Design a protein with these regions (language model features):
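Short, acidic/small-residue loops that bind anionic groups at enzyme active sites
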Residues: 26-28, 113-116, 160-167
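RNA-contacting regions in translation and RNA-metabolism proteins
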Residues: 124-126
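N-terminal glycine-rich phosphate/adenylate-binding segment common to multiple enzyme folds
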Residues: 1-36, 48, 142-146
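Glycine-rich phosphate/diphosphate-binding loop of Rossmann-like nucleotide-binding domains
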Residues: 28-32, 36-121
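Short acidic, glycine/serine/threonine-rich loops at helix termini
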Residues: 12-17, 88-93, 128-131, 148-152
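A glycine- and small-aliphatic-rich helix-loop capping segment at beta-alpha/alpha-beta transitions
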Residues: 16-24, 93-100, 154-164
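Glycine-rich phosphate/nucleotide-binding loop
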Residues: 128-167
């Protein structure tokens, strides 16, 4: 079973194509007018930029829905990101999933004989190809889009895949 976060990432992104050299920055302006600013890159020529986002509230909701669904279906949860590269964005997903599990679901999972397992997305891809099932593999929006197609193709057919929106 694939669990795909249905908010944010590249599906609510902002992109620009730059025509020449310049400084690419990420800027956040708080309601009080103060700013956080980070240089992404000093572009030496034309290129492309993409900004993505997510909210803690949405990630928390995804985590809770995932753990509840897994308990209902009596399956363990795998969660995978690339937090070794995306330390802030993917790291926040990892942190929230772990906190929600520890504070709200750990006892229920132990009682049901189920597990929560975090790993890097690379490792999850390798593991899922050998997996006999009985898991809910949770991914961020884009990762879940791509990986659900891979799983459906490897274990049947894209045309046989079904989707259920859970909130």
């Amino acid at each position: 079973i694939m669990g795909r976060h249905a908010y944010g990432d590249v599906y609510k992104n902002c992109e620009i194509e730059v025509k020449g050299a310049g400084k690419a920055e990420l800027v956040f302006t708080y309601e009080d007018g103060t700013e956080e600013r980070k240089t992404i890159m000093q572009m030496k020529g034309p290129g492309i930029l993409q900004g993505i986002h997510n909210t803690e509230k949405s990630i928390e909701s995804f985590a809770r829905c995932s753990f509840r669904y897994a308990l209902d279906e009596k399956v363990s949860v795998w969660f995978a990101t690339k937090d070794t590269i995306s330390k802030t964005y993917d790291g926040k997903f990892k942190e929230i999933f772990q906190r929600i599990f520890d504070e709200e679901f750990k006892a229920e999972f132990e009682k049901a004989g189920l597990e929560y397992f975090y790993t890097l997305i690379d490792d999850a891809v390798a593991r899922v190809m050998k997996c006999e099932g009985n898991i809910l593999w949770c991914c961020k929006n884009y990762d879940g889009d791509v990986m659900s197609d891979m799983v459906a193709s490897a274990f049947g057919s894209l045309s046989m895949m079904t989707s259920v929106l859970v909130s």
